[in-house]
From Swiss-Prot:
PANTHER family: ACYL-COA DEHYDROGENASE (PTHR43884), ISOVALERYL-COA DEHYDROGENASE, MITOCHONDRIAL-RELATED (PTHR43884:SF12). InterPro entries: Acyl-CoA_Oxase/DH_mid-dom_sf (IPR046373), AcylCo_DH-like_C (IPR036250), AcylCo_DH/oxidase_C (IPR009075), AcylCoA_DH/ox_N (IPR013786), AcylCoA_DH/ox_N_sf (IPR037069), AcylCoA_DH/oxidase_NM_dom_sf (IPR009100). This is Nitroalkane oxidase. It is an enzyme of class 1 (oxidoreductase). Gene3D superfamilies: Acyl-CoA dehydrogenase/oxidase, N-terminal domain, Butyryl-CoA Dehydrogenase, subunit A, domain 2, Butyryl-CoA Dehydrogenase, subunit A, domain 3. It comes from the Eukaryota. Its EC number is 1.7.3.1. It comes from Podospora anserina (strain S / ATCC MYA-4624 / DSM 980 / FGSC 10383).
Length: 430
């Protein structure tokens, strides 16, 4: 395709809808949840009306593939939506987008027999939450290397039921609005029906089981527990607690991915979300730049001219603008490549990983650069700068940490004998 950064009619529509959503729905949500103490679970619960309004507006249905009855568009359109929302109110936005991540394994792997699980998210009613329940308290970065024990959350087949036991952490939305379980959890776990044999690849035991709120209610009190609500410096209206499943029984029909197929689908979900984390980074960089630019035009720090006329300030600010443009270009290229190529899946995936790593780390640097430019006034909580940094700092370490997971995946791609560094740009040639 020719290189053209003009938005299509559909992309312009996405941008306009995202702009309206961010300013008219998400921004007021911030004023609501800030009325509650920092890191209080009430902050998350107070955003339920906002979430319900987003559902009514079709945002959840837009995160489901048309193949499954949704109205989902392209990955570039998703990136436009995420960037716009993150430039205005990232915390309330993450709850919405985390449901999209929770539904991604179904988008990737569901068959007709799984339609019932998607029904609540296609209705446009209520405030259903979905969650990709992946991370564990002890970490999972090395859990699937050969010789490792694999996931500590297990599922054992007993008759026509799977019995789930284990603890999970950081899975956004997994506890639901009342902290008794979300509407749909894609639980990534290890098949423990038979033991992992010495030398066996732990990936061969990874499966994904769908656990609904009805399943948890049927299992009764104590089957699902919130052990701790995690206090975080940013995204303070988001819920991603430490939870425990105890002898949760679900029917065999709830298996989305049997043992041996779960890891591929879970990592496939994170390949798509890598691009969207890139867009999150761009949104935060935008917000940091805009706030610093406004400050520089209005403030002179006791001098004779506005700060923007000072070379030191202008150099820092122009650097942030340049990095923001570069980050967006990489994000859009990765989004386009994931769905259109060129190159094989590994080449496309490399761009998604690069977008996640580059944009997340650039966002942190952008926030610190504008803080250095603004000076001590940036430390005032009435200004947005410290909040932007507290939000940005999680991007390199969540959704697959850059050091422990994302850069290791890049390393694995480069180690392959078939690695072609530039096929995602020029295609493959003999």
């Amino acid at each position: 395709m020719p290189i053209d950064f003009h938005l299509s009619a559909s992309q312009k529509g996405t941008y306009q809808a995202a702009r309206s959503l961010a300013r008219n729905l998400l921004m007021p949500a911030r004023q609501t949840y800030l009325q509650h103490p920092p890191n209080s679970p009430l902050r998350f619960q107070s955003t339920q009306p906002t979430y319900a309004a987003a559902v009514s507006a079709g945002i959840l249905k837009g995160q489901i593939s048309p193949a499954h009855g949704g109205t989902g568009g392209t990955l570039i359109e998703s990136a436009i939506l995420v960037e716009e929302c993150y430039s205005v109110e990232p915390s309330a936005a993450l709850t919405i987008f985390a449901t999209g991540l929770g539904l991604t394994p179904i988008n990737l792997a569901a068959g007709p027999q799984h339609a019932e699980f998607l029904a609540p998210f296609l209705s446009g009613e209520g405030s259903p939450l979905a969650s990709l329940v992946f991370s564990e308290p002890g970490g999972v970065a090395n859990a699937l290397e050969k010789g490792a024990p694999g996931f500590q959350t297990t599922a054992r087949l007993e008759g026509d039921e799977w019995v789930i036991n284990g603890e999970k952490m950081w899975a956004t939305n997994c506890a639901g609005w009342d902290f008794k379980g979300c509407d749909l959890a894609c639980v990534v776990c290890r098949d423990a029906t038979t033991p992992l044999e010495e030398g066996q690849d732990p990936e061969n035991k990874v499966m994904i089981i769908l656990v609904t709120r009805a399943d948890l209610d049927r299992n009764g009190e104590g089957s699902f527990e919130v052990l701790r609500h995690v206090a975080t410096p940013g995204h303070t209206s988001v819920s991603g607690p430490h939870v425990r499943y105890t002898n949760v029984r679900v029917p065999t029909k709830n298996v989305l991915c049997p043992a041996g197929q779960g890891a591929k689908v879970a990592f496939g979900a994170f390949d798509g979300s890598a691009v969207l984390v890139g867009a999150m980074g761009v949104g935060l960089m935008r917000a940091a730049f805009d706030a610093a630019l406004k400050f520089a035009k209005e403030d002179n720090r006791g001098g004779a001219v506005p700060l923007l006329e000072r070379q030191a300030f202008a150099d820092l600010l122009s650097g942030v603008k340049i990095q923001t443009e570069a980050a967006r270009a990489l994000t859009w290229k990765a989004a386009h490549a994931m769905e259109n190529g060129p190159g094989d899946y590994d080449a496309r995936r490399e761009l998604a990983l690069a977008a996640k790593v580059f944009c997340s780390e650039a966002a942190v640097k952008a926030c610190t650069d504008v803080i250095n430019a603004v000076g001590i006034s940036a430390y005032d909580l009435q200004r947005p700068f410290s909040d932007l940094l507290n939000t940005a700092v999680v991007l390199p370490i969540f959704d697959g940490g850059n050091v422990g997971i994302r850069r290791r995946h890049l390393q694995q791609l480069m180690l392959k004998p078939t690695y072609d560094a530039w096929s995602s740009t020029y295609g493959s040639f003999p």
